[in-house]
Amino acid sequence: MSPRDDYLREVGRILRMSEDEFTQVYLLSLGQRPPHPLDPTDGVLMPAAAAWQRAVSGQREISYVNNVQWDLVAYNQPFADIFDGGIPPENTMRWMALADEARDHILTDWETRWAPGILNQIRLAHIQHPENRSLARLNADVKRDKYAGPIYERSTEVYIHPDGDVRPLYHPRKGPGQITMVVSEPASSPGARHVVLLFDLLDEKPTSA
């Protein structure tokens, strides 16, 4: 008989396991990764943040890194150029879901092309990290919002991640276009994301993979 999730978590806390140690014990015991981290703050603090900043600064394409609760950790100048005054938001998902600048100007066709996917990401992140207060606040704020709330409640879209998605975007300096999203996860920060946006103007042929 395999041990239960709550038993393994109690053992992990008593022994003060690191997240990597807990994941290994969980895999050996149950044959799968834990559905959410042992420490609710895991993925919030990124130990390699400085290295990621150097990495994204050297990229030509729009690039940024956010943590498990979508706080912006690192970004390059092409990413900053998307925003008013060249100042990106502190939390990328809160901006995409709730900011007028995003919904009315930058994220073209927000209600149909952007909202269903990003709101489901918020829902799933809150379920996966139930003790994360920032995600709980974001989830609650989205449900209360007069535009995002109804979409959140009626959405039935199965959507886990945006990797490979192509979406319309209005670039303040370049004009209307579309982005292809390339997403990966920093190994030392489960749930964090490294995002690259490949931007193509509407009158240009999209970059081949």
Across the structure, where does each feature detected by a protein language model lie?
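Alpha-helix initiation/capping motif
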Residues: P3, D39-D42, M46-A50, N91, ...
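Residue-level detector of functional hotspots within protein domains
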Residues: P3, V11, A49, G58, ...
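Short amphipathic recognition helices of helix-turn-helix/homeodomain-type DNA-binding modules
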Residues: P3-V44
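A short linear-motif detector with a strong N-terminal bias
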Residues: R4-D6, D42-V44, A74, K146-A148, ...
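Short N-terminal edge-element motif at the start of the domain
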Residues: R33-Q69, A74
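N-terminal start-of-chain detector that recognizes signal peptides
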Residues: P34-L38, G43-L45, N139-D141, S155, ...
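PAS-family sensory domains
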Residues: Q59-E61, N66-P162, L198-D203
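Low-complexity, glycine/alanine/valine/leucine- and proline-rich hydrophobic stretches
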Residues: R154-A209
